[in-house]
């Protein structure tokens, strides 16, 4: 091999390694880790991760089980916002699980709390419309549905 062909060989090798890494990561994510299940509305997908099992089991005993699945409360409406949220959350859930750095007990992020709060207000608009204005302000004003009703979706 001539000295001038080394850069081309390195580029081909680097490209092949990068491609192999991407394929390997994709196979791991979608086959071993059941990543395909997160593209559905099946609540069982949330229970794939053992740290979510208690939340899933609590949901199966809650009244919302009859009317809502995980995505109804934990992802925003609309195809693109829903899957952006699922991808973002999936990345961080995977990161924290892989590194062992997930908080115990689990805590909902402020962004995801806002999504859940807006879902409560959407489904229960007939009730929340008549509540005092402090309750109908921004979810981040300190008063939210879960301030008083934090165990409704997931009975402790």
PLM features: what roles do these ranges have?
Residues 2-156:
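Short sequence/structural segments immediately N-terminal
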